[in-house]
Regions:
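Alpha-helical DNA-contacting segments of helix-turn-helix folds
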Residues: 28, 61-69, 111, 115, ...
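Amphipathic alpha-helical segments that line or abut small-molecule/effector binding pockets
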Residues: 22, 67, 87-102, 153, ...
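Short hydrophobic/aromatic patch on the recognition helix
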Residues: 45-55
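Hydrophobic alpha-helical connector segments
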Residues: 64, 78-106, 117, 128
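Short hydrophobic clusters on alpha-helical segments that form packing/core surfaces
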Residues: 20-28, 73, 97, 163
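Basic, helix-initiating cap at the start of DNA-binding domains
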Residues: 1-43, 60-63
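Amphipathic alpha-helical packing segments from all-alpha helical-bundle domains
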Residues: 118-145, 149-164, 182-192
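C-terminal peripheral helix-coil segments that are non-catalytic and often amphipathic
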Residues: 1-4, 135-142, 168, 172-212
Length: 212
């Protein structure tokens, strides 16, 4: 199949987009969340127009950084290939997501602050987050059979909402770094509680217990 002109342009533009994203991350690490697009262009070693041409706005760059974080969560979860059923995997996914956010708290707090505000065009953070939680749920083993079909349709979005809520308090400084994972786990267990297989709960599965 012949490669289209737009495909070739996209392939050529990807290294430039990456340079801009990485430059933005470097500025954020220096606690320069209010950097200008001119400062960003200088840091990336590109023309002033390039960040606009590649992304359109600063908000879009922040969304791109956020997307990279979710991609990292996804890759690490897949690599871990955790055993157990859906609730077990969900807690591993929560821990994975929290650990990614805590690796660069200064950068990620700044990004969360940006993507939580209105932007010229809607982002894809919700869709990406839903996809990550869907990955952990898989076929829903360990969920109540009668509720499983509906749960698989609704849980990914509810977990996306819940995790974003926990992150919002962390971003605002109301949750310490050391508390992020524990509160995120509590959120996930509360959401799952109503749809977990009753037999599983009666067996005292570790996923329903507090982490040590």
């Amino acid at each position: 199949m012949r490669e289209s002109k737009s495909d070739r342009s996209s392939a050529r533009g990807e290294p430039v987009r990456l340079r801009v994203i990485e430059a933005a991350e470097r500025l954020l690490r220096q606690d320069k969340a209010e950097f200008s697009m001119r400062e960003l262009a200088a840091e990336a070693g590109v023309s002033f127009a390039t960040p606009f041409n590649q992304f359109g706005s600063k908000a879009a760059i922040m969304h791109a950084i956020s997307a990279r974080r979710v991609e990292l969560m996804d890759a690490r979860f897949r690599k871990a290939a955790p055993p157990g059923d859906a609730p077990d995997r969900m807690l591993v996914a929560v821990d994975t997501a929290a650990s990614v956010m805590l690796e660069e708290p200064v950068v990620n707090r700044s990004v969360m602050g940006w993507i939580g505000t209105a932007s010229p065009a809607p982002g894809t953070a919700l869709a990406r987050s839903e996809a990550f939680w869907s990955l952990a749920l898989a076929a829903g083993d360990g969920l109540a059979p009668a509720a499983r079909k509906q749960a698989l349709l609704t849980l990914p979005r509810q977990l996306a909402f819940g995790f974003r809520g926990v992150l919002s308090f962390w971003t605002a400084g109301e949750l310490a770094d050391d508390d992020l994972a524990a509160h995120a786990r509590e959120m996930a267990m509360a959401i799952l509680l109503g749809v977990v297989d009753g037999q599983r709960q009666s067996n005292g599965n570790p996923a329903q217990q507090e982490p040590e």
